[in-house]
């Protein structure tokens, strides 16, 4: 079934049992938006609500089995890009924006690490290997970094250069270091008037995590060190996310 196009499309887009399906993520987003309507803009709420009704159309799973599938994916892509645009243009840069940005970049960082692991694990994290650009193209496209990679790096070998872009490149918006530095900026804003010892502990915890990446020299990284770097960063960031939620959100 995992090789069946219809199955995969429905699983990713509208499977009620898949916690990370687009449908379930939109439902959760709407619940969050409804609970904080006084903190978000009318435009943002209306867009999320519209997307919610689109995803809950009972005919959607059937349409994904027809030639309408491509137009549905195109519409979803457009609507999610619009959501990003509305969020950026209309949201005041207060605490709501701060929490939203921290959550977004934690998720982005974890996605980058997971996708990177998925491509390096099958080749034993071999940084001196000679996998061709076709192998790395899918990873780079998934992270919206293929074009930047082509412009920034010369030809082979790619294995170590891809790590440089997706983990250590401060100019790449989906890199691990870029997302960690943005989280750090928002944490500074969030904690600037907070004297709670728990807040200081949390900020120090994140500072150690960021320094771990910051002071690693990818030029001399070994295969095993890369494997451990990705694994440890993922574990530490997940733990930070849990601790952050416990401090600020009582339902966690």
Give residue spans per PLM region.
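Alpha-helical transmembrane segments and their helix-helix packing motifs
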Residues: 1-252
């Amino acid at each position: 079934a995992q090789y069946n196009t219809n199955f995969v499309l429905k699983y990713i887009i509208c499977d009620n049992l898949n916690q990370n399906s687009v449908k379930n993520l939109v439902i959760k987003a709407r619940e969050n938006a409804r609970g904080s309507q006084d903190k978000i803009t009318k435009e943002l709420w209306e867009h999320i609500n519209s997307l919610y009704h689109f995803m809950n159309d009972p005919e959607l799973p059937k349409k994904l089995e027809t030639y309408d599938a491509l137009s549905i994916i195109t519409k979803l892509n457009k609507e999610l890009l619009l959501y990003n645009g509305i969020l950026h243009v209309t949201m005041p840069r207060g605490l709501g924006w701060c929490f939203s940005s921290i959550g977004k970049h934690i998720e982005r960082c974890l996605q980058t690490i997971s996708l990177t692991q998925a491509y390096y694990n099958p080749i034993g994290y071999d940084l001196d290997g000679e996998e061709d650009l076709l192998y790395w193209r899918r990873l780079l496209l998934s992270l919206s970094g293929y074009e930047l990679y082509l412009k920034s790096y010369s030809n082979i070998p790619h294995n170590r250069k891809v790590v440089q872009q997706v983990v250590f490149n401060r100019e790449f918006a989906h890199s691990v270091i870029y997302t960690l530095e943005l989280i750090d900026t928002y944490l500074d804003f969030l904690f600037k008037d907070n004297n709670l010892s728990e807040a200081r502990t949390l900020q120090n915890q994140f500072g150690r995590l960021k320094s771990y990446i910051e002071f690693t020299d990818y030029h001399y990284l070994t295969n095993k060190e890369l494997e451990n770097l990705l694994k440890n960063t993922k574990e530490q960031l997940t733990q930070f996310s849990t601790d952050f939620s416990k401090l600020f959100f009582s339902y966690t």
